[in-house]
Amino acid sequence: MKAFNKLFSLVVASVLVFSLAGCGDKEESKKFSANLNGTEIAITYVYKGDKVLKQSSETKIQFASIGATTKEDAAKTLEPLSAKYKNIAGVEEKLTYTDTYAQENVTIDMEKVDFKALQGISGINVSAEDAKKGITMAQMELVMKAAGFKEVK
């Protein structure tokens, strides 16, 4: 559970790293993946110039990695975390279960997200000024690689 909470905070924290954003003509995307403590994570960034427009994450959480053996056990741990995303502007979250793992998909529209509400999930503080500047793809690449993610080409 502690490992999952750290992992969960890492994913959210990656969203909240800010610096000045540039402009460009066409949208591009970059995908990063990692297997952290038995949890498979794939994060895709859509960006224009150097400004991140959207982040989508697909997380496959093995029940064993959170100390659960059944869907019901996993739900007791994961549903309260999932519920925190509900009603946050610019965030879509879906959590589904199989017999051995949970699949969480989260999409964050960086141009619509309520950063103040989002930071409440992980407890990270971001100033209003930083939120207005935007998130750069260059910074996200550094954050992802430092966290053990590899770019998927």
Curated annotation (Swiss-Prot):
Concerning PROSITE patterns, the annotation shows: PROKAR_LIPOPROTEIN (PS51257)
**Which GO cellular component terms, listed alphabetically, does the Swiss-Prot or TrEMBL entry include?**
plasma membrane
Q: Which SUPFAM superfamilies match?
A: YehR-like (SSF160704)
Q: Which domain of life is it from?
A: Bacteria
Cleavable signal peptide: 1-22
Keywords, ordered alphabetically? Cell membrane, Lipoprotein, Membrane, Palmitate, Signal
Q: How does it sit in the membrane?
A: Lipid-anchor
Localization per Swiss-Prot or TrEMBL? Cell membrane
Family of this protein? To L.monocytogenes lmo0207.
Supply the name of the protein: Uncharacterized lipoprotein YehR
Identify the coding gene: yehR
